[in-house]
């Protein structure tokens, strides 16, 4: 009787460790650190975590859980959204790195993106006036993938202004 109990306890402990590992890769610091690395690279000050923005992001992510659509919330904050296909364990760093990868398509001198390219996610990440972020992640229902959103305050990407 002791052996089955031990096996069950070990299985439960391993499951808890795997859940904690997944949560650890999507903690506030897992969003803040890559944002701040990108910001430091262009001489912009750090952002800090906002539980208010996190709550807004989580509420919106929960609304996307059934369809996983890349659709903006239309809320009062700056916003970046990310979708990752089913079958992969998309993490905070995957989303932020995706947005930061647009740097190569941004020309600071002209404050424009390369022809046919997108760079607004990157400019929001490094927007000097944005000082707070809050993010959320959901695994969408029916094998639709992962939806990640980050919100920024004050919002960035003001037309006619450079990010830094």
Curated annotation (Swiss-Prot):
Cellular component terms (Gene Ontology): extracellular region
UniProt modified residues of type Pyrrolidone carboxylic acid: 25
Pfam family, one: CAP
Biological process, per Gene Ontology: defense response
SMART domains in UniProt: SCP
Residue span(s) of domain SCP: 34-152
Keywords, sorted A to Z: Disulfide bond, Pathogenesis-related protein, Plant defense, Pyrrolidone carboxylic acid, Signal
Disulfide bonds: 68-140, 113-119, 135-150
Family assignment from sequence similarity: Belongs to the CRISP family.
Name used for this protein in its record: Pathogenesis-related protein PRB1-3
Species: Hordeum vulgare (Barley)
